């Protein structure tokens, strides 16, 4: 695999340039002799979660393909599912640049992207065009300029528009880069949002004559009591799954490393243990009521197995994929 060579080139660019270049050119390599460098034929590891059939339990986490423009290329790498987004009702440019930083000594990434995306209508058009046969999750959020009190409306708008094209819908209430968003994870605000989403899910299921599961993505920076409260709310409102976790605001693991003082969410290896502990606590609180998709610092088959042992049914990768490349998918699926 030539990824180490590609990484050497990409890491000479700033992180956002490298990302944009990859998203632009990867689809163009499909169907050419060069796609042999990332196309994988992997062993089947079928699993059924949230009523959906996955060819294997390894997925691409949201954030890498925000606008769904690279689905088939990522699919060729062997992912059992691909989560696109986060997408918002209206296009938005996100936060000021620079907003993406590599913490290379720790194989971590700090981002404060701010839900930059081309809007939900563009994303849905891209998903419709995709030939990928696996499960596509669509991660939805709210626009930055939508008051938090009206945030529920943005989620419902997105849900209406993506429902017919989504394998499952992921509700992102845990990004640290949209002001006030994480407040939706607590108490009455969470209950009110989940209740509204559940009602709309039932309406859309009747309209389209199919049931699309809802999964909620949570932060790692929750206390044990908060994890218990989130679990109770998920069960109470009949949510189908939970994604644990998003990025962390903590910096203890990288305090003396380059970019440690940058604002934003930290992902990658520094998040590995913290996210696994949240999964372990969450699994205990849920007691099998709904499945967990584990994400956070997975950079090896062993790290993936730790997430599964802690209580996850599926896993997702992002930062580990940036550092290790497509062979990481093959390693995890083969040795999980």
From Swiss-Prot:
CDD domains: DHOD_2_like. One of its GO terms (molecular function) is dihydroorotate dehydrogenase (quinone) activity. It is a peripheral membrane protein. It catalyses: (S)-dihydroorotate + a quinone = orotate + a quinol. One of its GO terms (cellular component) is cytoplasm. The active site is at 175 (nucleophile). HAMAP family: DHO_dh_type2. Belongs to the dihydroorotate dehydrogenase family. Type 2 subfamily. Catalyzes the conversion of dihydroorotate to orotate with quinone as electron acceptor. This is Dihydroorotate dehydrogenase (quinone). It comes from Aeromonas hydrophila subsp. hydrophila (strain ATCC 7966 / DSM 30187 / BCRC 13018 / CCUG 14551 / JCM 1027 / KCTC 2358 / NCIMB 9240 / NCTC 8049). The gene is pyrD.
